[in-house]
Amino acid sequence: MHYNIILLVDGTLSLEQANQVEQKHQKLLEKATEFKSEYLGLKELAYPIKKQLSAHYYRWSFHGESNCTKEFKRAANINKQIIRELIINREKDYGYLGSVNPKKQQLSLQKLTKYNEIIASENNPDNPDAPVTSGLASVKPRLSRVEKQKERELEKWTVVHQSGNFDTVQINPYRPRIKRFLQNNQQTSQANNNQPRFQNQFKKGAKP
């Protein structure tokens, strides 16, 4: 099978140190043949990945068996100096198996788009140091539940300030949590009103 791999190595390392990391992981490819390695340069990332702002880019091309990248992927995932890797199996992703599987077609297209844009940025002589904005570094980091909530609140108040109408921000009574809260308040009020003490006070006109 024909493989292409894009490897991102920690940009704070010197070129010599990055080459050592790259060569160390080359040896983990089992029985790889026709191996070609190309250094694409030190590039700025679109956003921090593992607290790094830049990375050394490498492109590998080789042939091997279907499980030849298994050990490489395991080592790359636990090595902090490897920021990210993109593995493309040309035959599996773009061959017959990929052509009959819609999900694999979509995933393969995403991988190919990332791969082509990384190569295109390398082949741009006018601006070779331009940051990669839609390649491996373009995937938006996953937000936590609290961060998502803050993001929604920020979007809501942005709309309010732009429109200038603060009355448009209302509680949605159909949201499960708000609905339970309103029901509990209603039940509490009814229970208080049904107590004899409250009924007698209301009859006499006294304040509760």
Curated annotation (Swiss-Prot):
Region (Disordered): 121-143, 185-208
Coiled-coil intervals: none
Keywords for the protein's UniProt record, in alphabetical order: Ribonucleoprotein, Ribosomal protein, RNA-binding, rRNA-binding
Transmembrane regions: none
Transport as UniProt keyword: no
Keyword Ribonucleoprotein: yes
Gene3D superfamilies per UniProt: 3.30.70.60
Alphabetized GO MF terms: small ribosomal subunit rRNA binding; structural constituent of ribosome
Composition skew (Low complexity), residue ranges: 185-195
Entry GO terms, CC: cytoplasm; ribonucleoprotein complex; ribosome
InterPro entries with a match to the protein in the record: Ribosomal_bS6 (IPR000529), Ribosomal_bS6_CS (IPR020815), Ribosomal_bS6_sf (IPR035980), Ribosomal_S6_plastid/chlpt (IPR020814), Transl_elong_EF1B/ribsomal_bS6 (IPR014717)
PROSITE patterns membership: RIBOSOMAL_S6 (PS01048)
One matching Pfam family: Ribosomal_S6
GO process terms (BP): translation
Family stated for the protein in its record: Belongs to the bacterial ribosomal protein bS6 family.
Role noted for this protein: Binds together with bS18 to 16S ribosomal RNA.
Entries under PANTHER family matching the protein: MITOCHONDRIAL 28S RIBOSOMAL PROTEIN S6 (PTHR21011), SMALL RIBOSOMAL SUBUNIT PROTEIN BS6M (PTHR21011:SF1)
Protein name: Small ribosomal subunit protein bS6
Species: Mycoplasma genitalium (strain ATCC 33530 / DSM 19775 / NCTC 10195 / G37) (Mycoplasmoides genitalium)
Gene that encodes it: rpsF
